[in-house]
Amino acid sequence: MAYLLIRHKVADFAKWKPMYEAHRSARDAASLKDRLILRGLDNPNEIVLLFEVGDVIKARTFAASPSLKAAMEKAGVVDKPDAYFLQ
């Protein structure tokens, strides 16, 4: 089983969350299943996401896609995400 762990900061969690949820179909197409959405205790705008990965190639392609980058910018992601593929 493979997983994808992502950490990034957002400008405003309340704005980011509905935009993240609206992008679910793209994550589904990339074989990413949401497992956890966590927020920092000291900084609630620091987000950690854990996904179960069904197809690593699809997930890597999606993670590097310009459309994801644009969606993240629109949702208010304010730093470069840290992304780790794990097993």
Question: Predicted regions: what is each one?
Answer:
Residues 1-70, 74-87:
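Short S/T/G/P-rich N-terminal loop/turn motif that feeds into the first structured element of a domain
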